[in-house]
Regions:
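Radical SAM enzyme [4Fe-4S]-AdoMet core and its adjacent flexible, acidic
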Residues: 127-267, 271-275
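A general structural motif
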Residues: 25-27, 72-76, 104-106, 132-136, ...
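Flexible mid-to-C-terminal extensions adjoining Fe-S/redox cofactors in radical SAM and related proteins
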Residues: 15, 258-354
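Short cysteine clusters
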Residues: 36, 40-43, 254-256, 314-317
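Short, flexible/disordered intra-domain loops and linkers
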Residues: 115-122, 146-152
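Short, P/G- and charge-enriched loop/turn segments at secondary-structure junctions
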Residues: 17, 227-232, 301-304
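Conserved alpha-helical substructure of the radical SAM core
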Residues: 2-111, 116-121
Length: 354
């Protein structure tokens, strides 16, 4: 199978041999839905029970096929959400069609394990996944998920999956929380939950984008916007190893949710890669040249008021984009609505959890 050459991208063509190139995307996270049984404070995509969207089988297969065109045998597909197991029959149909069409195996399937309440059901589903070519299962276990998901199904799923799939094919993110009931925080008061949030971030840092740029980011905000002057995102866009594709076909670089590089319903993924140039999309150009601080000029002209402090550059970027989204600025790039809070963030930075 022929793999695309770096020179087939329009940005790379005019670069000297030593200049950093726009890398080939080798992985794609296919977000089957924005719907989730949880609404975790650190979710990059604002997933929740109120959300919807379901990636059509054909869209999923097209993305899968396109990634193979891009990366050949190195292509890695993972299925995520939202929570894919909310749509079990749809998930099975995707996997069955992929196998039928010879698209190879799915590298990773993610779940929070909410459904794993019966040993027989777990075994039946895992055996079906093995038969359909899923290589690894990733189970989300952390204080953020355990605010919504009982730990017992996740434990049961992890134990059964390690027995049926083998321990090397089961990833628990994060294993340390699997046996610790202190982190089942659904009944904690706000102050207690916040203490656990802070401890968790210190153990396993994450970006403050999506819902994480709301209340959670406010717990860590310590730097003024000016502290991020000159901190650009060029390396992040050029060096991204993969993309996420949402249920509607929108393509996001890495984990930069809410910044649309293209839509595979309109243009195949490999053509989006070929046409990507960091200077052609205004928002991306500014981020690559100046970072999120560079977005302030336009935002201020429209009435944006800075927060006293931000947690990181992703917090600054997301907060500004939330403001621009609400004013319908660059809607083809700043979207979709699922990736943004449903209402404006007040001065403290909190965004409504939906």
């Amino acid at each position: 199978m022929r793999v695309l050459a770096l020179s087939e991208n329009i940005y790379n063509r005019n670069l000297s041999r030593d200049e950093p190139k726009f890398k080939l995307w080798r992985s794609a996270g296919l977000m089957l839905t924005y719907q989730c049984n949880a609404a975790c404070e650190f979710c990059y995509y604002h997933c929740s029970p109120r959300k919807s969207g379901l990636m059509p089988v054909g869209t999923c297969l097209d993305a899968w096929r396109s990634l193979q065109t891009l990366a050949g045998a190195a292509a890695k597909i993972h299925l995520t959400g939202g929570e894919p197991f909310l749509h079990w029959d749809h998930l099975v149909e995707i996997l069955a069609k992929g196998k039928e069409q010879g698209l190879g195996s799915v590298d990773l399937l993610e779940t929070n394990g909410f459904w794993a309440t019966d040993d027989g059901l777990i075994a039946d589903r895992l055996k079906m996944l093995v038969e359909l070519g899923v290589q690894r299962l990733k189970i989300s276990v952390d204080p953020f998920h355990q605010e919504y998901v009982d730990i017992e199904p996740a434990r049961r799923l992890a134990a059964t999956a390690k027995r049926i799939l083998g321990p090397d094919r089961v990833l628990v993110r994060w294993e340390k929380y699997l046996g610790d009931l202190r982190f089942q925080i659904s009944n904690f008061r706000l102050g207690e939950r916040e203490r656990v949030y802070v401890e968790t971030y210190r153990d396993y840092p994450f970006r403050f984008t999506g819902r994480a740029a709301g209340h959670l980011a406010g717990l860590f905000a310590s730097k003024p916007a000016a502290a991020f002057r000159g901190v650009d995102c060029r390396a992040g866009f050029l060096g991204a190893k993969g993309v996420h594709i949402d249920p509607y076909g929108n393509v996001f670089s890495g984990t930069c949710s809410g910044i649309i590089l293209g839509n595979i319903g309109q243009i195949p993924l490999q053509e989006i890669w070929k046409a990507f140039h960091p200077g052609q999309i205004e928002l991306v150009r500014i981020l690559c040249e100046r970072g999120p601080f560079g977005l302030l000029e336009k935002a201020r002209s429209l009435g944006y008021e800075e927060l006293p402090a931000y947690a990181d550059k992703c917090h600054l970027c997301t907060h500004i984009r939330q403001f621009l989204f609400e004013r319908h600025v660059e809607p083809a790039v700043i979207g979709p609505a699922d990736c943004y809070a449903p209402s404006a963030s007040p001065p403290g930075g909190r965004m409504e959890r939906q």
